[in-house]
Amino acid sequence: MSVKASSIAAFALFALASAPVHAQALPKGDPVRGQTLFAQCKICHSLEAGKNGLGPSLKGITGKKAASSAGFKYSPAMTASGLTWKAAVLSEYLTAPMKKVPGTKMAFAGMSKPQDRADVIAYLAKN
C-alpha cells in the first residue's frame, strides 16, 4: 500500500471511529403499561386538550413541535429548542430532560429504563 493510500485509509478509519453513535431503536411499547407509568406524569400533565397544569397538556404530543401547546408558559430554553416530539426525541428527553434541554422547567430526573420510556411513549401516541 502506498503512503498516500495508507494515509487515506487511516483518515477514513479515523472519520468512521469519530462518527456519533446514534441512539438504539426503542423497544416496542405497551400502551397499557404506559398508562400505569403515566400516573407519575399526571402530577403535572393532563391528557385533556388545553388543560395545562404545572406542565403543559400532553394531548396529541407525538409529532408536535415542542413548546406549542396553547396557554402554557414555556421556558425560553424549550421555546428555542426546535424539537419535534417524535418517539426517539421523546425517549431522549424522558431519559434526562435537563440534559436534553438545559434550562427546561421540567423538574423530573428522568426515566432510565428504555422499556418504561417506550411504554409511556406508546400510551402518549394513543392519546
Model-derived regions: residue spans:
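N-terminal secretory signal peptides that target proteins for export/translocation
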Residues: M1-K4
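C-terminal segment of classical bacterial N-terminal signal peptides
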Residues: S7-I8, F14-A23
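Electrostatic cytochrome c docking/interface patches
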Residues: V21-F38
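The canonical Cys-X-X-Cys-His
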Residues: G34, A39-L47, V120
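Detector for the c-type heme attachment site
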Residues: H45-K51, G63
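Short Fe-S-cluster ligation motifs
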Residues: S68-S91
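C-terminal capping alpha-helices of c-type cytochrome domains
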Residues: T84-N127
